A protein has these predicted regions:
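Acidic-and-aromatic substrate-binding clefts and catalytic sites of carbohydrate-active enzymes
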Residues: 26, 88-90, 155-158, 187
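Short, electropositive alpha-helical surface patch
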Residues: 63-64, 97-109, 158-175, 200-203
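Auxiliary Fe-S-binding modules of radical SAM enzymes
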Residues: 162-269
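A structural motif
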Residues: 77-78, 144, 176
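Conserved Radical SAM active-site core
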Residues: 2-108, 112-120, 129-133, 138
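Alpha-helix N-cap and loop-to-helix initiation/capping positions
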Residues: 22-26, 61, 123-131, 159-163, ...
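Conserved strand-turn element in the central/C-terminal portion of the radical SAM core barrel
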Residues: 114-116, 123-125, 138-160, 183-186
Length: 269
């Protein structure tokens, strides 16, 4: 991935990459493979992307692989949900609108910090949070629902009520459908731990030592503010009608909807 997020789990050795993380493997025939798969599907479903590598890295502007895949999804009448940190997804809002008119399209956007200067440090090659917020608003204005991921919250850095409230305000103003948050903290494994600590040494003096003292070699680094902040997120979501809870939001993301079937049902009524 080209985003350079200092906390990225995909750097972990468990994924057995045999090249530099910053070197991009391009699946040039992605749209052809997708089309062949969709042709064989007996039932329509939701197609998702963005779990391991962002579909809107800077290289996508040139390659247009994601756009070609969206065109295939639209052609065959499937639904789609993409997870990204990039405002570049705006380029394809026309296709998301077409897909959503016939079935269901959902934008998933990750937000980590309401502090733009901090955002540029921990996510150096990504659209800043304000740009992501504007993207969420634009999708809502075009009738396309969105889900926001709150992840990760780095202990002693962005695991504060002030930050959470700033992100929640963005979500309320953008009228997001749901929020996913597994907890306040992050995970570190062999491979990404070393890179993360090297970035802490560069940008946050003495922070690595604080992490090692507090968490040792743990995989799960849970913030001491976890319960307080998770309750805060839950309370605000409940008060503003925002879906919250991993099971509920995932169920919504996975559920395929056909506008044509809905219309025919109403026609019969």
């Amino acid at each position: 991935c080209q985003h350079g997020c200092i906390y990225c789990d995909a750097r972990s050795k468990c994924y057995q990459m045999n090249h530099r993380f910053e070197d991009i493997e391009v699946k040039e025939n992605a749209s052809e493979l997708l089309e062949n798969a969709l042709k064989r599907k007996r039932r329509k479903c939701m197609i998702g992307t963005g779990a391991m590598s962002d579909p809107y890295i800077p290289l996508e502007k040139e390659l247009k692989l994601t756009r070609r895949c969206l065109e295939i999804i639209d052609r065959y009448g499937f639904g789609v949900t993409v997870q990204t940190k990039s405002a570049s997804v705006m380029r394809d809002i026309d296709l998301f609108t077409k897909i959503n008119d016939k079935s269901k399209a959902v934008l998933q956007m990750t937000l980590t910090t309401a502090d733009e200067s901090l955002c540029r440090i921990i996510e150096p090659n990504v659209s800043v949070t304000k740009e992501r917020f504007e993207t969420l608003k634009a999708f809502h204005e075009n009738g396309i629902p969105s889900v926001v991921w709150f992840s990760p919250f780095l202990p002693f850095i962005n695991d504060t009520k002030e930050n959470i409230d700033g992100l929640l305000k963005y979500c309320i103003d953008a009228k997001v459908r749901g929020i996913i948050c597994f907890g306040i903290g992050l995970t570190l494994r062999d491979g990404d731990r070393e890179y993360f600590y090297s970035r802490l040494d560069k940008h946050f003096p003495n922070m690595k030592e604080r992490y090692i003292y507090t968490y040792g070699n743990s995989y799960q680094l849970t913030s001491s503010n976890n319960n307080l902040l998770m309750n805060r997120i839950s309370e605000v979501c409940r008060n503003h009608g925002i879906m919250f809870g991993v099971e509920n939001v995932f169920s919504y993301l996975h559920k395929f909807e056909s506008k044509a079937e809905q219309l025919s049902l109403f026609d019969r009524i």
